[in-house]
Amino acid sequence: MILIDTNILIDLFAEDPDWKGRSLVAFRLAKSRDALAINDIVYAELAPGFPNVAELDAALAALDVAVVPTAKSALFLAGHVYQRYRRQQGTKLNVLPDFFIGAHAAVENAQLLTRDARRVKAYFPTVEVISP
């Protein structure tokens, strides 16, 4: 399974002129390698771009992207990584969605398709990143 970060799907759905082409190439490459999925955190981040659940589900189905729940072990890891971030003078006061997504990939030993390769590798060095 390859997990997809929100930024890649936003590039595709919003037709971002700067990133759509590169993200589409990376998406197609990932799809040729393994099944694609997002977790519930990514689903929530995508929701504001759609008028209802049915349309978001249809958009994901059209791309053959499954939605998988985030395991408790990934949530636990995300909390600990966030704590490390705060100790290193991180300014965000809540656990960042990127930590949930990266922790999910780490716990599932899944590759992660993302534009935030540097941040993922900094906090989740075992995660194999696919980046446009």
Feature locations, PLM:
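Histidine- and aromatic-rich ligand-binding microenvironments
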Residues: 4-5, 38-39, 94-95, 116-117
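Alpha-helix capping/helix-boundary segments
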Residues: 8, 42, 74, 100-101, ...
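Acidic, PIN/NYN-like endoribonuclease modules and their adjacent C-terminal/linker elements
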Residues: 1, 28, 102-132
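Short, well-structured N-terminal submotif of metal-dependent ribonuclease cores
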Residues: 1-38, 47-59, 130
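Active-site-proximal, substrate-binding regions of enzyme catalytic domains
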Residues: 51-73
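Short loop->beta-strand "edge-of-pocket" segments that line small-molecule binding or catalytic clefts
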Residues: 2, 35-37, 64-69, 111
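Structured helix-beta-strand junction loops
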Residues: 32-33, 62-66, 108, 126
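Active-site neighborhoods of divalent-metal-dependent phosphate/nucleic-acid chemistry enzymes
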Residues: 66-111, 115
